Each structure stands twice: as C-alpha cells, then as structure tokens.
Amino acid sequence: RFTAGLNLPDGMGEQGVYRKMEEISGKNTVFRHIFRGAGAYNHYIPAIVDSVASKEEFVTAYTPYQAEISQGILQTIFEYQTMICELTGMDAANASVYDGATAAAEAAAMCRDRKRSTVYISKAANPQVIQVIKTYCFGSGAPVVMVPQKDGTTDLEALERMLAQDGQAACVYIQQPNYYGLLEAGEKLEAIIHGAGAKFIMGCNPMALAVLKTPGEYGADIAVGDGQPLGMPLAFGGPYLGFMAAKSDMMRKLPGRIVGETKDSRGERAFVLTLQAREQHIRREKASSNICSNQALCALRAGVYMTAMGAEGMAEAAGQCIAKARYFRDKLREAGLVPKYDGEFFNEFVTRGPLAAEGTASEEALEDASSAEAAGAQAAAGSRILKALEAEGILGGLPLGNGEILWCVTEMNTKEEMDQAAAVVRREVKGI
C-alpha cells in the first residue's frame, strides 16, 4: 500500500480554474469561416436541438433490457426512424450505428452470403469510409475490389466489366454525392449492379437528400450515411451517428435495434423493440453485427433537427448550399484556381493548383504527369494558399495532393466570407 504523500499542486479556487481553462483553450485555432467538408459539414443548428437534447431524461437515459418501460426514449427513436425512411425513400431504418463509415461497413456485411461475398467499392467514395469497410471485410475474410473512377465519378464501363467477370459480387458501394462532390449516374449504376445480381448500397449526404433523388428512387437496396449534418456540431470529429435504411426484403438483416409501433393491453399506442431475434444478445455469434447500444442521443438530435427544419427548411438550406457553392467556385476561378471536374455537384468541388491555370508559364510542364518537379511546385502553391487563408482566420479546403483542393460551401458561408477568401487566394496566386 502506498503511504507517501502525493506530489500534487495546491488546489485552485473557482476563478483560478476558469483562468487556467481559458489559457489552455486559447491555444486552440478557432476559425471564423470554414470552407472544408469531406465528410463533416458546418451547418446551422437551431437552438431547440441543444435545448431538447440537453434534458437530463435524454442525456442519462439507456434503453434497458425491459425497453418497453422507456416509452419516451422508444418514441424518439421511432420518430427518428420514420424521418430517415422519408428522407431516403426506404422501407425500414434502424436506431442508428456509430457513424457513416461503420454504417457502410455494416451494410456490406448485410449483403454477403455463402455464394456471394465480394464487396465492390467505388474509388470516388470517401477514403475514410473505404478504409473502414476494408477493415470490417478483413476480419470476415470477404474480398474487397476497388472500382476505378473516371473524370471524378465511378467508371461505369469498368464496373460493368468487373461485375460480369466476377459472378460473385455481393454488393457495390457508391457515394452520392461522391467524395469530390460530384453526382453519380444513379439510374445507370442501378441497372449495372442489379443486372449482375449484386446489392446496391448508396452512401448519402442527408442534407443533399432534401433536394436530390432519394436512394429509394434510384433503386438502391440499402441507404447509409453520416447523420452529422442533421444537428451535430463538428466537435473535433464526434460524436456523430450513422443512419441505415433498407428495402423491406433486407429489413431482417439490418443491424442494431429497431423500434416498432404496436398497441398495449389497453389498446393504446405503444412502442417496442422489434425483430430482436436477429440481434447479437440473442443470436450471439450468428448475428451479422455486434452493435447494441448506439448513438441514441445523436439520433435524438437528428430527429429534433429534422422536425424543427421541416422538409421546406431543409430544402432551403440545401438550395443555399448549391447556389453558394457555385458562386464561390466562380470566384475562385477568377482568382486563378481552375475547377478540375465539369460534372454536376452539390456543395463540394475540386480545384487544380494555381500553376495549372490557362496561360501560365508552367502550364505545359504541368501537363507532364511524370514531372515530379511540377507536382512539387503545385503542392507548395496549394499549401501556400491554405496557410494564407488560415492567417486570416479562414479554414480553406482539404488538400488532396499536387495542389488540388477540395472545397465545401454551406448555408453558413456568407457572400462577404466567400469574397474575402477569394481575395486572399487571388493575392497569393499573383505572388506565385
């Protein structure tokens, strides 16, 4: 037993603690303007979301094994599931999983069987999501095949050829919009994937679903995505939530908890955990997933957000994302950053390095893909632009390498912010 005195400093008063915490937090870099997405987006969160989600009944609640005694919690999950089904155009949704990446991996696990086990993933999907799917598949021994991208979207001809040669494809994961912000050809993808007997998994940005075709309209079998845009702050990467929804024929393979509506002994509306026989606490090692407790508080936030915004409010926010992203892209083009892709996009887009602009002295050299010197110059130029933006309190886009930058615009970005960022870019491009 340790009996010596502990080498601890003297206690601090409350005022001193506040000063110390402010000193520590002052070391953080806080950006006033954000133009970066790549999976986590800076959307406005109505005040009612924090107000409801901070109630102690929700913060401390846990769905016990006798879940039906927690009718309030079950109802919030049921309402969340209902809204996710409406948003995705699917028949059933679960109570959520950890995040968008694990939702995609769980969806891939739903599709595998003894005859079909190969998982196909578009290279135009988010690299972090791809890595999580690969990690899950490594544990189960399922083969993973990457589908090449062409001009920023999934190569349809390559996908059709690969699926025809395989014959054992379990599923194909496509992201809409994809990692580069571009819209995929959903109808053509559905025909190719289902024509090969595979399942179609569509990863979605829930904000984009307010204005784009739903996965259900595209004919997808499973819709997944990260619910962060639905009322979750950026918060250094979490906690977020992964939403999952599926067609009725896949419902019994959904992982995690599903809340259903029924009537109690008095004939009144009641909520229960349904289809529990497929879950790990009953099926044990035969279950397709081991998730049980999930992101229920985050799902509550998403439910409150969707209720507060409504269909019209979400469509308005999504419409602003679309319009402002196009304005900012044009301002960056004027400043000297050339868009890399010409396809339709939602609120994210990629620009090439400033040295690739038409009419620059280095244009011909940069066309030579083998020129390491040119690639290094591009990367340095892109880094210089992002550092200049940071010095102005602006978080620029995500560097993709070789001077390419993935930009994001949401309803939070004002015209003044976009003009200011473009002015900084123009100044730096002139100095390169």
Say what each PLM segment does.
Residues 1-78:
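N-terminal entrance/gating region of PLP-dependent enzymes' catalytic architecture
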Residues 2, 55-67, 85-89, 115-116, ...:
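Gly-rich Lys/Arg/Thr-decorated short loops/hinges at beta-loop-alpha junctions or inter-strand turns
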Residues 7-11, 67-70, 97, 119-123, ...:
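Hydrophobic alpha-helical scaffolding
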Residues 31-34, 94-95, 141-147, 313-318, ...:
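Flexible, glycine/charged-enriched surface loops at secondary-structure junctions
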Residues 65-69, 85-105:
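Short loop-beta-helix segment that forms the pyridoxal 5′-phosphate
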Residues 102-268, 335-336, 340, 351, ...:
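Conserved PLP-enzyme active-site core in the AAT-like
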Residues 230-335, 339-342:
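Active-site C-terminal subdomain of aminotransferase-like
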Residues 312-420:
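Conserved C-terminal alpha-helix-loop-beta "cap" of PLP-dependent enzymes
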